Amino acid sequence: MINIIIKANMKKIILQGYDVGDFSNQQSIVPIYKGNNIEAYLAQKAPEAREIFIYAHGSQYFSHEHSLPQLSLTLQSSNNELVPSILSKITENTEENKPNIVHILSCHASTAHYNMQNINGNIVLCTYAPANYVSNGYVAELLFNTKNNFDNLNDFIVKKLPLLTAISFGISYKLDENVYPLIFDNSSIKGMDINSFSEFLQKQYIKVQKFYTNLQEKYVDKYPELFPEYNFPEKISYSTEELKQAFNVLLNLDSEKLSIEEIQHLLAIDNSHVGNILADAIKCNRTDAIEVVINTMKEATTVDLHSAVKFNNLAVLNRLLDKTEKVENCILQEAIQEHKIEIAEMLINSNKIKSFTNDYLLVAINANNLPILKILLNKEENIVGYLLYRAAELENINTAETVELLFDKTKETDYFINTRVLLRAVKENCLSLINKVIGRMNEFDDIPDVIFDSVIERGNTQIIKILLEKIASFDFLIKAINSNNLPAVEDILKTIKVENKDIAAIIMSGNTDMFKILANKIGDDKILDIAIKLGDSSVVNNILDEKEKQGILDSNKLDEIFETAVKNSNGNVIEDIMNRMPEVTGKHLTIAMQYYAPERAFIFDKVYNSIKQIEYNLILTAIDSGIPDVIQKLVSKLGDEKKASILYDILRSSDIVKNMVVSNILLNNIAKIPDNYKYALLDLTSKGNSYGIKNFFIFNRLLEKSGPIDEEHLNTYLGLLDPSDMFSIMCMGSLYNMKHLASNHNNITTVEDTIVDNLTVTGEINITPSDVNLL
């Protein structure tokens, strides 16, 4: 009995290089390290030995067999590391020099066995490809999954010896600076049959026994965890299926090195998986090998069809289509994406595609494959809107042609799809598609700004005319104006009915060329009116200069223009117009009063300051307007005599509000009431006018501006005061505190007491001497 076993239940991990596919069950078996994580893992300390799978692209540094191999573990191939340096990092970071088990699943992996002396530390290395072989994903995954069914390495080697022999499995132990390799050679089994291969395996089995026996005897004491007891059967046997699998793996491992006779021989033993050999044969254009493989297979798989599509081999694809009942979606999609038109057409016409879905169209659209799209559209009756939207989004050359094909096949399109398609059509000046989209749009649909921008940018007048029949002309005109596109502006103005907002937009652009185009269309009177409203002095003056040259600018026209300017509060324009007038008169000030508002006060001031003489009727007009600021300005130029006369007329009116407001303004501007108006005004306010209106507030203000009052009038006015009226009380204070009364009464307290007594007797109001002083 020989005892050889590798420690079971070691922690398994995988270092996965870039650009290699995942194994189907790797996530559930091992932690995975990729990219920068690999570098971090190789740098960290490990307390226990591990079982490590390195799955990466491998290459030999030199061409000869024993050269140093490389592994591509990172994204950049220039960062490839030599296998010995990677393995040394693993061993050096394992505590107590415990031996790790490392499996290299890559091309040329066996080369590593010839460089074991370059590795620092103890290690068990397993490889699964000869030094001169290129491995493949099928074989790598098969071996990975097979090994993971065994925790015991010896079990794996013994029970899977046919498979390992076929792939030239190699194992090396590096212990205490000594290297012990065992490497199988598959070259002799290519011509064997099942029986001879079975006999050959018995000899290989004896080599395995001897190899481990020697190691166990030498190292069992020092490394007992590597060499516990293991029971080797006296004789080993394998099932026919296991033996066939080995031949099939050999067939797929590197078929380029097999002769046609060897291929035929191996296929005769097992043809269950021929995907790799067929792919290699198509790639190398080995027609004899292709013929042999296809004749042998019962049914073509998706992998086989993929190989024919990948290498664009119509003849092989045609043969394979005869060997399958159904073509999977991915095959046709691949042909479309790769722009393999003949391949795609053959697949479409093969009747092996069960249903044509919009998925194929999407692939053709994304690939901008117009020929294939045309073929596919013949198979589809109705296209979903998303495909049309997607096509319109692409920025490829001649996308509009693709979009138009889809648009014709899409029965229903919404606003968003229509606008996106319209933008694409505009960008490529596709008039036919523009007409189709416009015809399908709702009359109330808005056109996004991006379409306006695109139309104006290209300046295609035909497109402009088409769109003007559908869309709001003003928005379109604004875009043309803002981009200074004269041809577009001219075309739009020819088509639309020009409105004030259009004129305003052109005026505000400041573009004189556009201005001339507009003037030719509507005449300058309309432009002048809008320019005045906008306050554009430059345009106004240009038009007025032209009218002066033509002799058609008279005073009536200027008055009309002046009133328009006043209405629109354009001070600069008003000033320019007044400068053209022979004289600014009351008529112009009346207009300014007519449209007066606090925010327009500056306009009134401009006109007011330009008038040389204020006529009396203007003042009356101002008073009638009831505008305090206007009245204030006009009466300020009058003398006190004239102001008193107007005040008398105002106080005689029946308008209480005007009576109060205008009287106050006048009194604010009168320094002293003329004597000839003093008693007339005081009588009018205290006794009442013909309408019975008294105004003790104004009466009190008149007292302030009237000077001394004789005793007769004083007594009369005191008798007229109403103690219940607040303003009457104010008047009492004014009367009793006038200077001329102080000189006629030696004891003012007696006078105050008299007032208080009189007021108290009335029973209507009580007032104290201190109240009188306060008043």
Swiss-Prot record:
This is Putative ankyrin repeat protein RBE_0801. The keyword Repeat applies. InterPro entries: Ankyrin_rpt-contain_sf. Gene3D superfamilies: Ankyrin repeat-containing domain. ANK repeats lie at residues 66-95, 300-329, 331-356, 357-385, 447-476, 523-552. Keywords: ANK repeat, Repeat.
